[in-house]
Regions:
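Nucleotide-sugar donor-binding catalytic core of glycosyltransferases
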Residues: 2-67, 71, 79, 87-94, ...
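Short amphipathic alpha-helix with an adjacent loop that forms part of the alpha/beta core around
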Residues: 73-77, 337
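Catalytic alpha-helical scaffold of carbohydrate-active enzymes acting on polysaccharides/glycoconjugates
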Residues: 77, 97-98, 116
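Active-site proximal beta-strand in glycosyltransferases
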Residues: 99-113
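Ser/Thr/Gly-rich flexible loops in soluble cytosolic domains mediating phosphotransfer, phosphorylation
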Residues: 111-121
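Residue-level signal for the nucleotide or nucleotide-sugar donor/cofactor binding architecture
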Residues: 293, 325, 359
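Conserved acidic donor-binding segment of nucleotide-sugar-dependent glycosyltransferases
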Residues: 321-328, 337-341
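C-terminal amphipathic helix plus adjacent low-complexity
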Residues: 332-442
Length: 442
């Protein structure tokens, strides 16, 4: 359905859901990225569509709501876009048929995979193209769609907002986490660290509990860079993708999915995982491999950070990143790097340089245009600012088994837990931070 656009800027319609919690950085990034590569961009807030109930016959449900979805589609189509881009995708399905009937491709970005795959696998087939932040979900989505227009695409950064040197460094807490610290396994890591500091270091955990944008202590996107830059060490622990107890009992074991036909080789979760996680709609208990936005944003600011070792993509794309496989190791590395500022800054600069050269939303949006066929190649005017295309486009070839569950972490490779470091020669009694001499391609 996509047509190559040449001789004029591509027109990208952003159908955004402004009410999403923790997606402001994404929404800001897509607009910035498309504009920076020369696209004409216009936004539509489709949040009112969330009132339309979702059902298996979504188009029927939408039509029962009269002109609301049709009106949004008409407004968008009057602008004559080359692509409609829907972040998250859950409510964009109400306009997807109208958009495609007019001959315009519509793509969604699945930003909460694999935690929501029990739902996304049902509505993603209604889009022309699907982009997922986690390659572990690609086989499922391809199987549900019956075609290959499914692509792996990580989050990125808006470097007008997240870049080094713009904010005062290191004046705040020694360690800072920005996000929902109540999600497993973060409490184990951060409570252990909090106990170990015991006055020896200061921590800023924002937030210990689930909050929304109406919360009086809500920290808006404009404040992210200054807050993260204030720390000596950024704290980053990825959520566990394992199915939640509520999802297992209310969605899977209740027979709710009895009418859903899965692709060959896939099956719904049939036994309790070793530990309940945060996959509130992860009905198949799929594993996770992706790197979260927090890593890219903290790194782009030039702030050193410590992450958990449960994500294979972190080990593959950032082999010199410092990771910990358990709370005890997390604490050990926190104090080691707190006491070694020069080594900390050298690691931070390496990570920052790599993010700024390969992982901005300019790179992500350029890749989108290539994948959907609006560009045949990168315009010559952008080649110098984006760098070599092979360095920043995502590989789409991964060996993954549909039998794999979240109880089999994708991140515990040797490179993630036992690499050698070219940067540090720890003295007796210190932990040797992980790293390697390789810079891997996307």
């Amino acid at each position: 359905m996509s047509r190559v656009v040449s001789g004029r800027p591509p027109r990208i319609a952003l159908a955004q859901q402004g009410g999403l919690v923790y997606s402001d950085d994404y929404l800001d990034g897509w607009k910035w990225g498309f504009e920076k590569i020369g696209c004409e961009v216009r936004e539509w807030d489709i949040t009112p569509l969330h009132n339309i109930p979702l059902s298996r016959n979504t188009i029927y449900s939408a039509r029962n709501w009269g002109d609301l979805p049709r009106g949004f589609a008409r407004q968008i189509l009057e602008w004559k876009p080359d692509l409609v881009w829907v972040h998250h995708g859950r409510y964009g399905i109400h306009i997807s048929q109208y958009i495609q009937e007019a001959g315009v491709p519509i793509a969604c970005y699945l930003c909460d995979e694999p935690y929501e795959t029990g739902e996304t696998m049902l509505y993603a087939p209604r889009y022309t193209h699907v982009f997922t932040m986690d390659h572990c979900t690609i086989p499922l989505h391809k199987g549900m769609r019956g075609n290959d227009s499914v692509f792996y695409l990580l989050p990125g950064v808006n470097t007008d907002r997240f870049s080094p040197g713009k904010h005062q460094r290191g004046y705040g807490p020694d360690g800072v986490f920005l996000g929902n610290a109540s999600l497993v396994p973060r409490p184990w890591f951060f409570r252990h660290l909090e106990s170990a500091t015991n006055g020896k270091a200061s921590l800023g955990i924002y937030y210990w509990n689930t909050v929304n944008k109406q919360h009086p202590g809500w920290i808006g996107l404009d404040k992210y860079p200054a807050l993260l830059s204030s720390a000596k060490i950024g704290l980053n622990v990825h959520r566990s993708p394992s199915i939640t107890e509520d999802c297992y009992k209310r969605r899977v074991m209740s027979g709710r999915n009895a009418r859903t036909v899965l692709p060959e080789g896939f099956k719904f979760c049939s036994k309790e995982p070793k530990e309940w996680g945060t996959g509130f709609w992860n009905d198949l208990d799929l594993p996770a491999s992706h790197i979260n936005p927090r890593f890219f944003e903290t790194g782009a600011l030039g702030v050193f950070q410590i992450s958990d070792s449960n994500r294979s993509e972190l080990a593959r794309l950032f082999p010199d990143s410092v990771v910990a496989s358990n709370p005890e190791e997390f604490v050990e590395k926190f104090f080691y790097f707190l006491d070694h500022p020069e080594e900390r800054e050298e690691r931070a600069k390496q990570c920052c340089d790599l993010i700024l050269s390969r992982h901005t939303y300019k790179h992500r949006c350029a890749e989108i245009l290539l994948r959907v066929g609006l560009w045949e190649s990168i315009p010559e005017s952008l080649s110098s600012s984006l760098g070599l295309q092979g360095d920043w486009t995502h590989t789409q070839s991964f060996q993954s088994s549909p039998e794999t569950s979240s109880s089999e972490p994708t991140g515990h490779s040797n490179s993630a837990t036992q690499p050698t470091s070219r940067l540090l020669t720890p003295t007796s009694g210190t932990t040797k931070p992980n790293g390697s001499q390789q810079v891997r391609r996307l």
